[in-house]
Every structure is written in C-alpha cells, then in structure tokens.
Amino acid sequence: MTYEELCSFEVLYKAYLEARKGKRSKSKTIEYEAQALACTEKLSRKLAVRNVRQPGGDIRQQICYVPSKFEVFAVYEPKRRMVHAPAFVDKVVLHALVDNILYDALTKSFIRDSHASQTGKGTDDGLMRLKTHMVDYYRREGHGADGWVLKGDVRHFFASIDHWKLKRKLKAVLDKRGVDPRVYELLCIYIDVMEDGLPLGYQTSQLFALMFLDEFDHIIKEKYRIKYYGRYMDDFYIICSDKRKLQCILRDVRALMDSYGLELNQKTAIFPLRNGIDFLGFHSYLTDTGAVIQKLRRDSSKRMKNKIKYWETAYPAGEVTKGEILRSFDAWDAHAAHGETYSLRRKYADRLEKLLDCKIPIHRKINSNKLARDRRRARQCRCIYKKQHKALSLSVSQNTRPAGILPWA
C-alpha cells in the first residue's frame, strides 16, 4: 500500500470504525462520530504530503502532520505504570498504519514463541506454549522433571528503548518489505512524541517493542539451538538440561542487552525446573509424572478479593453498575480458568451472587492440551487440502478429522 492509499478517505474511515470499537461512550469518540465524514476528510488532508522550502532554498516533499496531545494517567494493576493514551484522531491514524501496513511487515519475521499484540498469540497462547514446552521436555528429552530454567526480565523495557536504534531497525525491516519510505517518516513522528522510550498506550508501541528484540529471539533459537524458549514482551524463559550452557547464555544475553541499551533486572536468575516458572500470571510446575500444574499467582487472587470487597460497598451506593461488575469478574474468571482454580473462582462467584442477586456461572477449566491438539489437527487439514489443490476454509471444525489422519494423532 502506498502512502497516498494510506491517507485516502476510504482507508481512514475503515480505521475509524475499528478505533471506535469499545470506546463509543467516551466524549472524544462521540465528538468525532458526530461529524465522522468531515473529520475523516480533514484528517486525510492533514496527512497529505506537502512541498516545503528548505533553508537552502530547495523544495522538498515533507509530511507536516503533527499528532495531538496525549492523555497521561496511571494504572495500578498489576503494578503502577504511566499510560500515554493518544487522542482519538491519532488512534484512527495508528489503526490505519497497523492494520494495513505495519502488522504484516513486522510480524513476518517473528518466531512462533514471541507473544503479545498478535492475532492468536496472546497470554492464553503463551501459557499453552509453556505447558507444551514443559511436557515435551519431560517426554522427549528423557530428563524427567530435572532441568534448569533461565528466567529473564528487562528492566523498564518501554522507557529504555533508544529511538535511534529503534528507527534503524524499523527502517531496515520496512525497506526489506518494500514499504513506502513516507510511511517510515510518519512512524518516526509517532516515535518522537516522547523524548525517551515508547509510550504505553500507543498501538504501534507494542509492535515496535516486539520488533526491537526480534533479533534476540532469533539468536536464542538459531545460534544457541534452544528449543524450549518463549517471550512475552520483556519477559522470557529458557528451559535446558545443562546449567553451564544457561550460564554462558546468560552472560551473552547481558552483553547483547547492553548493546541494545537495555538491562536485565534483578529478578533474572537460573533455577531448577522443579521450582516452577512464574510466567503470565501463573506459576507452572512440572511434576515427576510429567503433569503440568498451573497455579494462579497470589497477587492476582488478592486483587480480585479486594475488588469484591470494594464492590460490596460501592454497588449498594450506586458507584458501580451490575454490568461493570459482571464484565470485570468474567474477564478475570476466563484468565484464572487456565489454572487449578475452580474452588477459588466458585467462592468468589458465590459472594457476587449474594451481592447482585443473580446466578453467575464460571468458566470450565481451559484444557491447553486440547487446544494444542485442535490447532494441530487444523494445520494437518490445511496441509492435506493444499496437497489435494482444494480451497482452504478459514475455519476448521474442532470435531473434523480428515481422511489420512490416524485416530491417535
């Protein structure tokens, strides 16, 4: 897609429809929506390239678009962070960039186990892959539950990303994909909205952060031949049977992070696999029988307990609605359903049933082995259909087992 096509009314209007999802009750969204056609047309003109006279007298085509001021606020779960939320008009531009150009250009080189901000590769997929790695290590490596884990975390990841290094990596990727150079200029405008680091809250920041450590992912997988590795933004793990190898890798990782202008925090350590891996809100243990037990972190349970305590006083006072409580609890319940948490979730649901005077069902425990099996069958279906030169279906039924696949596969 060229820059002119990106700035066209049709593309920006589709981006506006995406940007307003889940935000139509907010004041800025309502203001834009009241005059959506006029605002989108005005935005299209602002993004257009203009002829600008340079100090030497030469005339150069330049993007003169200036992003609006962002809103800064703090979030306190799971820990205190400062979020820089862009204005709604900039959300439209960011959606146009990400949905039409940036996502495909950047994610093509990402490894399978680089999670976050990608379709089908969120926290649920990260937990499933960790469980798959632990089970596979137990069954195929022949080491049982004996082994070592390198668990790493980057200190102040988003705030520490150097703009010059990020732009250099970004330009190399976009040039390789044949992206219009003016798209890179527009992205640089959004990178420079802050003097240092990347703003939490911008849609592009998530992809930029993943791309910034994409080279690191490939080094771990290709240079060190590590099979059991996963990363979610700044949080990563490596499972290996050789402690000395992990010590060498850790030394090299520190040097590599230093070259990126980053630093591993104090939580980075090498420890026995039997201790379990703290990843994506769960503590995952590998037992002597090869089973993986995933327990919800204590702070997540405590936060929900405190929320319920607040709701028990705020709901009768009219400070929070029934719908808001149900949506918040349902989201937490869906996440907690990955672990051994049935009794805990049922206990919290019972308290809310007394408060709201309604029946609250809880999610069934999510079986990550079944999810992995269904995905494997879907891949097998696609391979068979390709060989038979048949049209691919966008969705594959979970119960469909094509001819040629053994019953126990």
Map each language-model feature to its residues.
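Short, conserved aromatic-histidine micro-motifs
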Residues: 50-56, 226-233, 303-316
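Conserved two-metal-ion catalytic palm core of "right-hand" nucleic acid polymerases
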Residues: 1-166, 409
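Beta-rich nucleic-acid/ligand-interaction surfaces
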Residues: 116-125, 237-240, 271-276
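Conserved polymerase palm-domain catalytic core
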Residues: 59, 133-233, 238-252, 271, ...
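Short Gly/Ser/Thr- and Asp/Glu-enriched loop/turn motifs at secondary-structure junctions
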Residues: 68-70, 230-234, 266-267, 400
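Right-hand nucleic-acid polymerase module
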Residues: 86, 95, 190-194, 247-248, ...
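A common structural junction motif
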Residues: 254-262
